[in-house]
């Protein structure tokens, strides 16, 4: 009759392949009819962990023999405290043994804990059992340790193979690190195996899957096969794991935010001066060709900060001594600007009180007269006589008020026509006195100077007199066209404004129709007038009305 063993796994979190986390039970096969006769009564592997935890909970909840004995004595009426109980000594001895066991486990690196969900005891293995990493220059010792560790793991696996039953079904898989044979299922409880351990397990299963029985000859051949093929791979894998752990430990940590310091300038400058003395910091900044005096400021500018999304953001250091000086200078400049503005406002108020004209208006008038003189305007002489004005100022028009303010210059401007299409008189008449006079572009001055040079060169030659007369005639025609376009544009703008007001008063709901009609009218009233001079491309005029 064959003997079968059942293994139950206590829910271990760290390493499920530890022998302390498994319980072995001997099973006697139950006689069954048919093909199921002589099959081992193995537990259900799908609910393996829950079944074992419930079994442990039931065992822990069962009362001990001492408690049952005391209960019987209480029911019999012999519950006397003076009588010596033979089981009291047993309980005391049991407690002492439990204390010794806990001290032994603490010394070995085990700590006992209780799972809140399953109420089942479990052992948490500390990380002190792991092998230490070799220091720099101890590569030979590390390789020897790897081979020693691989050899010992192979020996352990072979010892576990020898403990297996001799007869077992061939389709059952075998875990070297759990020392158990189990039917092939999707759920396998050796989850925390390394890559090398999985390779050894796979090779052993391939070797044992071909035979139903295990002999000493098979074990010896398996030993040779594992020693020749798997010791090197296990050592190599362990070495690679050590190097990966080293890289993770040597990886730079994330930058922390600078702590708030009551005197951050001195601390920051001290830190930078210490770095500047070191050779590594100087080697880093050689590519920038930074002098030692400018080194702290350059190093602060090179500081970068990464956001959570990974975007690089330059972090300006506001506590640098040089940046503090720059900020002070900017504050002083802003204060001086404010003082100037306040003084100008006071001067304007005084000039308006005394003369009736603000200082800004007087500046506008001066600039306008300069531009007019550049375009060919001649100032009136002393003998110029103004037209008479009525005595009652309440009846004066806007033009009469301006004649009174500006004098003979305004009267001379009414009859003045500049050499180009930009009508300076219209801009002057439309000015209210509060808005500044703005020229169209400074390019008109440069264009006028260039054209005068060209005309002087042409006039020097006697053959081109007819050409000059043609150019002057074309210029007069251009002025007339520009005036016609300007007048038509003003009338169309007034008509569109009146139509818009009428449509707004009539209906608020037809806003979309109004927008369409307005866009159509604006496109209908637009006229493109282009005047092309074949000689000068810069003087071509394109007017949109």
Curated annotation (Swiss-Prot):
Keywords: Coiled coil, RNA-mediated gene silencing. Residues 530-545 have a biased composition (Acidic residues). Residues 325-354 form a coiled coil. Residues 108-150, 236-290, 430-461, 493-545 are annotated as: Disordered. Disruption phenotype: Mortal germline (Mrt) phenotype in which there is a progressive decline in fertility with each generation at 25 degrees Celsius. Residues 124-135 have a biased composition (Basic and acidic residues). It comes from the Eukaryota. This is Protein hrde-4. It comes from Caenorhabditis elegans. The gene is hrde-4.
């Amino acid at each position: 009759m064959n003997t079968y063993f059942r293994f139950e796994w206590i829910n271990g979190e760290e390493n499920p392949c530890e022998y302390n986390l498994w319980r072995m039970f001997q099973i006697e096969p139950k006689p069954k009819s048919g093909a199921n006769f002589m099959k081992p009564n193995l537990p259900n592997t799908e609910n393996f962990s829950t079944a074992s935890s419930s079994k442990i909970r039931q065992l822990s909840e069962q009362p001990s023999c001492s408690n049952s004995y005391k209960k019987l004595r209480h029911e019999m009426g012999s519950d006397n405290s003076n009588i010596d109980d033979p089981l009291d000594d047993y309980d005391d001895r049991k407690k002492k043994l439990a204390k010794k066991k806990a001290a032994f486990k603490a010394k070995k690196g085990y700590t006992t804990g209780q799972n809140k969900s399953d109420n089942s005891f479990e052992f948490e293995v500390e990380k002190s059992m792991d092998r230490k990493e070799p220091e720099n220059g101890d590569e030979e010792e590390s390789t020897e340790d790897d081979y020693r560790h691989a050899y010992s793991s192979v020996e352990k696996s072979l010892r576990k193979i020898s403990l297996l039953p001799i007869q077992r079904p061939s389709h059952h898989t075998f875990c070297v690190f759990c020392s158990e044979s189990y039917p092939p299922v999707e759920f396998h409880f050796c989850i925390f195996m390394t890559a090398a351990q999985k390779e050894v397990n796979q090779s052993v299963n391939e070797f044992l899957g071909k035979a139903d029985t295990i002999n000493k000859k098979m074990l010896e051949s398996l030993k040779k096969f594992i020693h020749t093929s798997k010791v090197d791979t296990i050592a190599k894998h362990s070495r690679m794991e050590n190097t990966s752990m080293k890289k993770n430990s040597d990886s730079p940590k994330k930058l922390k935010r600078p702590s708030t310091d009551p005197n951050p300038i001195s601390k920051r400058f001290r830190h930078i001066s210490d770095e500047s003395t070191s050779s590594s910091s100087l080697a880093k900044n050689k590519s920038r060709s930074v002098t030692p005096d400018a080194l702290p400021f350059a190093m602060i500018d090179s500081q970068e900060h990464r956001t959570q999304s990974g975007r690089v953001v330059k972090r300006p250091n506001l506590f640098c001594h040089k940046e503090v000086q720059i900020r002070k200078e900017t504050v002083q400049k802003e204060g001086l600007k404010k003082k100037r503005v306040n003084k100008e406002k006071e001067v304007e108020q005084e000039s308006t009180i005394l003369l009736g004209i603000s200082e800004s208006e007087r500046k506008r008038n001066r600039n306008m007269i300069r531009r007019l003189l550049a375009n060919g305007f001649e100032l009136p002489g002393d003998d110029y006589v103004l037209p008479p004005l009525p005595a009652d100022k309440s009846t004066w028009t806007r033009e009469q008020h301006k004649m009174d303010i500006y004098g003979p210059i305004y009267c001379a401007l009414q009859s003045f026509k500049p050499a180009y299409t930009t009508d300076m008189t219209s801009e002057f008449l439309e000015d209210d006195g509060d808005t500044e006079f703005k020229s169209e572009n400074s390019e008109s001055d440069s264009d006028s100077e260039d054209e005068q040079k060209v005309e002087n060169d042409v006039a020097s030659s006697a053959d081109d007199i007819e050409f000059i007369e043609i150019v002057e005639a074309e210029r007069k025609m251009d002025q007339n066209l520009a005036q016609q376009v300007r007048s038509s544009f003003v009338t169309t703008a007034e008509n569109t404004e009146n139509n818009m007001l009428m449509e707004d008063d009539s209906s608020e709901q037809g806003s979309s129709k109004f927008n369409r009609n307005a866009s159509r009218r604006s496109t209908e009233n637009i006229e493109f007038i282009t005047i092309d001079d074949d000689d000068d491309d810069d003087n071509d005029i394109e007017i949109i009305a």
